[in-house]
Amino acid sequence: MSVQAMKRALLVLCCVLSVALMAAQAWAAPQKKAKARSQAPVVRDGEAEARLLEVYRLIGQAQGRQALAKAEALVTEHPNFQLAQLVYGDLLASQSRPLRALGDVPDAVAKSGAQLLSDLRDESALRIRALRERPPAGTIPAQFLQLSMRNKHAIAIDSSRARLYLFENTGGELKLLADYYISVGKSGIEKAVEGDLRTPLGIYFVTSNLDPKSLKDFYGVGALPINYPNPYDARRGKTGGGIWLHGTPPAQFSRAPKATDGCVVLANPDLQRIIRTVEIRTTPVVIADKLNWVTPQSVQPDSRRFADTLQAWRAAKASADMTRLLAFYSADFSFYGKNLAEWTPALRSELDKARGRDIQLKDVSYLHWTDSADTMVVTFGEVPEGARSGPVKRQYWLRQGTQWKIFFEGVIG
């Protein structure tokens, strides 16, 4: 290798490592709220990634000069984008020698930054994979069996692809608005206990929108907590909490694919788009190992079958026949520590207040989750006959043999 090439390669890795050091310092040190945050130029969500992928495309077409120019512009505008810095450095080095791999720096330098290089290569591969393996047109994640008009938006996360998908629900039809690169737990997925550094799998809902002024800079432009552990998690003895969708510190554009304590982390421009878009309490968040994309028509039979079960429950409740109604509840039903026998008086009180009036279920949504068991998360408004409104309830159903049984029921609004 020529002295000139060596200097360029060293310069590249120094750039990348310096960004990493800045990120580490931003993480470890107590941070004051930066006034510059509100003065930063507006960056469109997904823009930086799209520009990086364009650089990749130009490289693939052997248009090195154009790729170098675009990479230089990208790192000038986003100096904290470590992966872009690495690609830019490779393009500089390629002017004097052929490259062997992404992050092609001298062996001694590569050894000292081995973990960082490995993380950046993984991030690069996942971003390219997301471009190449797009969801088939007209498909949705299989978990979205039926959404109501109250669910104006929905989020689905595919951890195997390090990807978050943002949907808009219009007239019962889901439209994919955008998708973004994400980071998950250092130890991967399937959270079980507090402190295991894993991201949970399941069906959740956005519970709040935390004011960025109340957060450390480490969390970026904001945070959207979700309701982990949900009743299904609690049923299986899962512990922990504080799982958020949040941004990155100022010194870091994005994080390694597995870099969090269990949260889902996005680039700040991407998170800002999500924060501006989704609604609190009504936005479902599906976190899966791998999403199964299906046509809406293919899930209609399952939706209709479950709708029949739910209507049978409604009819039983309207009948005020306690024995008939309790047949829909699992023997191991649990409501925040109360078993079925302890919770039954509350159900009896509801029947007494209804005085035999019929009830209607409005704004019904079904979210289907399958792992070692088959579950359904159901949300609806329960409106007594003659009333204009009623409580919003959420039920968790479990398939037991050939029947669906309720193992949790609560009022959420």
Give the positions of each predicted feature.
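Short, well-ordered alpha-helical segments enriched in acidic and aromatic residues
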Residues: A320-D332, Y336
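Alpha-helical segment of the N-proximal tetratricopeptide repeat
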Residues: R44-A73, E77, A312-A315
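Exported/periplasmic cell-wall-interacting domains
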Residues: S208-Q311
